[in-house]
């Protein structure tokens, strides 16, 4: 009799419903699973292509009762053409130096992260994070994760982006910047940098997480065209007005 090794079963769980942080009056619930073991990379790749996102060593996707507002989106890097505003933002930040560094938390990063949270999200849970919470967010990753630091000519940290590298693209996990430089549109600049880096690495996509048409914090993502959205028929081109 032939014997075949059995794959270790992978378990998925649903979280308890909580108030949605993006759309007032709705409940948020997620399907989650842990990324661990020797297959963490391959599992993350497969789940990302199915619309999941990563936080720490957890992959998750929304499964909210009576709501499907969260739509996974990704930029088609090779076909992306920045608009006039994006070109201006790129030029305005040309004096910054970008460095890809290992996913290791530093005091310099945390100081900037804390200032950003206090300025932009003072009422949110992330504003309460201490250094060890921040370190966990950065370092608790079982996959290929890195940080891009953007520094000015004096070596001051102006912005940073935590990102994952996958076989088919780069995934923007979290970014933050100096609130005193808000007029420089550094959030947009970091997305543009990831697109250019994906092109340089011959990777087809930049994953941006979820587009939510009813949330100003999340609806901006349709500015990056061409964009693809994940739905029942897989990844399809997605433009402003599609499903909005």
UniProtKB/Swiss-Prot annotation:
Keyword Acyltransferase: yes
Keyword Lipoprotein: no
Gene Ontology CC terms: cytoplasm
Catalysed reactions, semicolon-separated: N-terminal L-glutamyl-[protein] + L-leucyl-tRNA(Leu) = N-terminal L-leucyl-L-glutamyl-[protein] + tRNA(Leu) + H(+); N-terminal L-aspartyl-[protein] + L-leucyl-tRNA(Leu) = N-terminal L-leucyl-L-aspartyl-[protein] + tRNA(Leu) + H(+)
BP GO terms, sorted: ubiquitin-dependent protein catabolic process via the N-end rule pathway
EC numbers on record: 2.3.2.29
SUPFAM superfamilies: Acyl-CoA N-acyltransferases (Nat)
Molecular function via GO: arginyl-tRNA--protein transferase activity; leucyl-tRNA--protein transferase activity
Compartment(s) where it occurs, according to its Swiss-Prot or TrEMBL record: Cytoplasm
Keywords: Acyltransferase, Cytoplasm, Transferase
Disulfide bond annotation, renumbered to this chain: none
EC primary class: transferase
Role description: Functions in the N-end rule pathway of protein degradation where it conjugates Leu from its aminoacyl-tRNA to the N-termini of proteins containing an N-terminal aspartate or glutamate.
PANTHER family: ARGININE-TRNA-PROTEIN TRANSFERASE 1, ARGINYL-TRNA--PROTEIN TRANSFERASE 1
Similarity-based family: Belongs to the R-transferase family. Bpt subfamily.
Protein name according to UniProt: Aspartate/glutamate leucyltransferase
Organism placement in taxonomy: Bacteria, Pseudomonadati, Pseudomonadota, Alphaproteobacteria, Rhodospirillales
Gene name per UniProt: bpt
């Amino acid at each position: 009799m032939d014997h075949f090794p059995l794959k270790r079963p992978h378990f998925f769980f649903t979280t308890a419903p909580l108030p949605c942080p993006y759309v007032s009056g709705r409940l948020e619930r997620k399907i989650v699973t842990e990324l661990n073991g020797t297959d963490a990379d391959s599992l993350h790749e497969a789940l990302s292509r199915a619309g999941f996102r990563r936080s720490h060593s957890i992959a998750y996707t929304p499964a909210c009762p009576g709501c499907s507002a969260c739509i996974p989106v990704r930029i088609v890097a090779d076909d992306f053409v920045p608009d006039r505003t994006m070109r201006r933002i790129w030029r305005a930040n040309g004096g910054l130096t970008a460095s890809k560094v290992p996913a290791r938390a530093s005091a310099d990063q945390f100081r900037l992260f804390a200032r950003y949270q206090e300025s932009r999200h003072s009422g949110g849970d992330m504003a309460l994070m201490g250094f060890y919470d921040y370190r966990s967010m950065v370092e608790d990753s079982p996959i290929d994760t890195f940080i891009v630091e953007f520094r000015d000519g004096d070596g001051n940290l102006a912005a940073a982006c935590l990102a994952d590298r996958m076989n088919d693209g780069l995934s923007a996990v979290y970014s933050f910047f100096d609130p005193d430089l808000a007029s420089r549109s550094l959030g947009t600049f970091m997305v543009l940098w990831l697109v250019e880096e994906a092109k340089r690495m011959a990777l087809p996509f930049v994953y941006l997480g979820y587009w939510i048409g009813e949330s100003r914090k999340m609806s901006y993502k349709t500015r990056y065209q061409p964009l693809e959205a994940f739905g029942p028929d897989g990844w399809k081109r997605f433009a402003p007005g599609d499903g909005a």
